[in-house]
Amino acid sequence: PLGKWTTQRYDFMQLKKILSHWQTGLDGKAWNSLFWGNHDQPRAASRWGDDSPLSAKMLAICLLSLQGTPYIYEGDELGMTNAYFKDLSQYRDIESLNAFKELTGAGLISADEMMECLALRSRDNARTPVQWDDSPNAGFTTGTPWMPLNPNYHEINAEQALADPDSV
């Protein structure tokens, strides 16, 4: 009844079976497009891992080890994570806002539980400005960004990554 709006983690054995199915099924017959995320998915490190640089690196190694053309969504090369917004007013995604209204209004889930779901599953997690540096607005703009910044832009950004030989 809640669809994607759950805090349940993904089944990695099922993911392994799916990846194996596509790799063996297309081998020698076709070429796959490979990606973990896009503007309609939560951040890859948060969705599939635990927000750590190690998880982001594991995802990159897995993606780049598969047969096909890898696509890396903006910020994933830095290990950008979900924003974990604390207030509904920080979200812009109509799907997220409608789901909050409908599911809490129907009494299927509490407002606090739905905020947890949004923090994990909302598309807005991948729509925050790219974190170029730790300056105001993460170096993304001198104007006012449409989406709030991910609060971790001081720690996760392109400038930091370039200076760290062990970065994602």
Language model: regions and residue ranges:
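Active-site and adjacent substrate-binding regions of carbohydrate-active enzymes
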Residues: 1-168
